[in-house]
Amino acid sequence: MPGLHQNAWVVGERSSKLKVFGPEGIDQFTQGIEMAYAHDYVFRNEHHGDAIAPLQFAGFDTRVIDLNNPVIFDNGELKITAFKVIHEPIEPALGFRFEYKGRSIVISGDTSYTQTVIDNSMNADVLFHEAQANHMLAIMEESLRSRGADLLATVLDDITTYHTTLVEAAEIANEANVKKLFFYHLTPAPRNYIQEIMFVRGVDQVREEWTLVEDGTLVILPVGSDEIIVTNM
């Protein structure tokens, strides 16, 4: 976020502050970034001038999402809806549904298995769902404890309680009648083909249509079509 907001200001020819939508507490986050960059804003403006780094457009225009009014953007073509997910003790944690001219994408955000993802993913073209291989974490935890690294082992055990396994995410996609499931935010991230095979263990027994994303995975939904194009940036 810090780098994005700075680059969009200096080289992005932004004509307003960067709009950021988020749950309660997002304003504290963006204010903290603005405080950290306060001198940088001035220095860049003095160096580059208003044409490149106008001070009036530095920083954020922060919007706190009201979950009682979950549609955070709707211009008649693009509609973005926020919904609450379960990632305790983080509260609130949000997922998002994007709808554009008959096509739809849902992003789960960080969450354990939760009904709200199913409800908000109904008949979506694409669901991006976080995925954690607890069976691999268990192996890592056992190895760490055998070497006396109990603190790190406990961390690995702790994170199993607030994420979703791949099989659970596949079941969510099935329940919601999602056309294509993409696993993202992979934990532990597989580094090679053998690890990928271990990572996705059990998914094929639950669902056929799924993809394990990589950095640069690009999903395109042509308007007026049911096609889902998967490529790389």
Predicted regions and their residues:
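Cap/insert and terminal regions of metallo-dependent hydrolase folds
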Residues: 95, 104, 112-215
